[in-house]
Amino acid sequence: MPRFAANLSMMFQEVGFLDRFDAAARAGFKAVEFLFPYEHPPETIAERLEKNRLTLALFNTVPGDWAGGERGLAAQPGRDQEFRDGVDKAILYAKASKCRLLHTMAGLWPAGRDKEAGERIYIDNLRWAADRMAAAGLTAVIEPINTRDIPGYFLNYTGEAMRIIERVGRPNLKLQFDLYHVQIMEGDLATKVRTLAGHYPHVQIAGNPGRHEPDVGEIHYPYLFDLFDEIGYQGWIGCEYRPKGDTLAGLGWAKTYGIG
């Protein structure tokens, strides 16, 4: 049976961030994920997880100036030291919270700029990050993101991601498989679930269009959940969606799985 992680950056907006751990646990979730924990000390995050017996499945390394529009540093020229400092900070949080996966965001890449130059930066930084994380027993993941939600994002397709992973050549660099983004950019989700099996330690879901609950829109998730079971997927499935209304009221899709 699939295992679901509540995304606390999007779900349970009815309460403040630190109270969302309690809310997720009360709803029946056994794990959580979120974008960034850095507004709170690592000890505070760890305490909330332990109190609610929650696993932290995934979070992102420091993305640069998120409020100012930046969306990662790994493929950004002249930002190597800032990127590395951010990775080290993320590792501290991961150790405190016993999280094993860190998403390393590439950032934006202006149209017309030589993308091969960005790819060289990206590969060098990912090698450094993967080695740093390996020393801490962690796995790095990269995620193709659709061009509608984040125009100009450096990495958009699973094929691109797999080519980058191959070029980096580190066993602890894997694919973050977000079905919402892949549906928008590529489709053919069931085939990709099978062909990419073994390369993704983390999956994320949302309905399309709208990025709401997974039972809203064109994607038939029950079929895909059964397919994950069929191929023996053991990782978490992150619920990275924006509830259309009250979070709990929108969990009808999850009752089959003991949530809501």
Protein language model features and the residues they cover:
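Short phosphate-binding/catalytic loops that engage adenosine nucleotides
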Residues: F29, L54, L138, Y233
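N-terminal small/glycine-rich loop or linker at the start of catalytic domains
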Residues: M1-S9, L58-L73, A106-P110, I145
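Glycine-rich, proline-tolerant flexible connector loops at the mouths of alpha/beta enzymes
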Residues: E33-N52, N60, A106-D114, D149, ...
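Conserved beta-strand positions in the central sheet of alpha/beta enzyme cores
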Residues: E33, A57-N60, H103, V141, ...
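Active-site acidic/histidine proton-transfer and metal-coordination neighborhood
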Residues: L73-K174
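Short secondary-structure transition/capping segments
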Residues: E43-E47, G69-G72, D114-A117, Y153-L155, ...
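Short amphipathic alpha-helices and their capping/turn segments at secondary-structure boundaries
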Residues: Y38-L56, G86-S97, I123-A134, A190-T195
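Histidine-acidic metal/acid-base catalytic patches
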Residues: M1-G28, Y38, K89, K98-R100, ...
